[in-house]
């Protein structure tokens, strides 16, 4: 099989290659002069090769409707004849001349969006044709203002005047549209959320009627649209909403708490699309745990660390000399000698003392005990007992 294919390929030459023709229905001019390009009714058989075709820079017409072109030729553009010259005067070579593309007629690509262009908050160029299906989510941020201030605390409710119906309702009843100004009353739709920020460009203040759900321009409304940041998602806080914010002198028990405000917060509410920097809502963040105050480390007592038990010494000699009661050696090592014998004027005689003398004697005794601890039993810090430190 392979040998048959190779033999056929060797026998094949360029003369045997058939030309590929494109049949395109093309209307011809009525009386065109096509003498330069040969007979238009010339029949070309499919078996003819490229070398058999006459060398002509133009297309060859067949049956006055179909034409085949040279492989070296480019795409041909038919230019319509001008009004001043008749089709008889124009030869077909001028009619079928390739026309250079006009740079003015080329489609201009749109400019790339800027860095600050946000897709979620973008506004199209033609605001009148854009009617999105987006509606505000049923969250607490879109409740009417007249329902605010009815929650919260156990204190007495503060009575407030309900705002007029024209500016009270902020609920969107129908599909919003992106109109840059307040729409007239005959429009059957209401503006979206960012038209509140765009409405400050208009000369007349805007208001809404809750019956029809459409926004209208009214010069007799109480206040213009509240100025806010352009395309902001934060809820609009106008003069009506600022009346229900708690003042600096109010307490949580005296002023009602707003239902859309989270409990325990006293700052302005934030939208879901904006980052929230509240520590209470950060879950799963690793922090250094503070030390438990119930488990305190024992403080180091250097006076106890300096005590070193030993069998013989100055303290034992002093206590044996005074004839005190027998006590364990670790207790006698640093216990001061009893001062009853030294405090009495006569060596072993007992003496009845008054209360004031007993208090003075107790103070002198404590002072001597502290002095004896420092002088008799004090060791330098380089000679510490590790076992005693571990026990303490």
Swiss-Prot record:
Coiled-coil intervals: none
Pfam families with a match to the protein in the record: FAM53 (PF15242)
Gene Ontology CC entries for this record: nucleus
Region (Disordered): 77-120, 141-167, 203-303, 340-364
Keyword Transferase applies: no
Residue positions, PTM Phosphoserine: 122, 162, 232, 234, 255, 273, 299
GO biological process, any: protein import into nucleus
Residue ranges, compositional bias (Basic and acidic residues): 278-303
Top-level lineage group: Eukaryota
Keyword entries, A-Z: Acetylation, Phosphoprotein
Gene transcribed to yield this protein: FAM53C
Polar residues bias spans: 83-93, 203-215
InterPro entries, sorted: FAM53
Sequence ranges of Low complexity compositional bias: 241-256
Modified residues (N-acetylmethionine): 1
Family membership noted in the UniProt record: Belongs to the FAM53 family.
Protein name from the UniProt record: Protein FAM53C
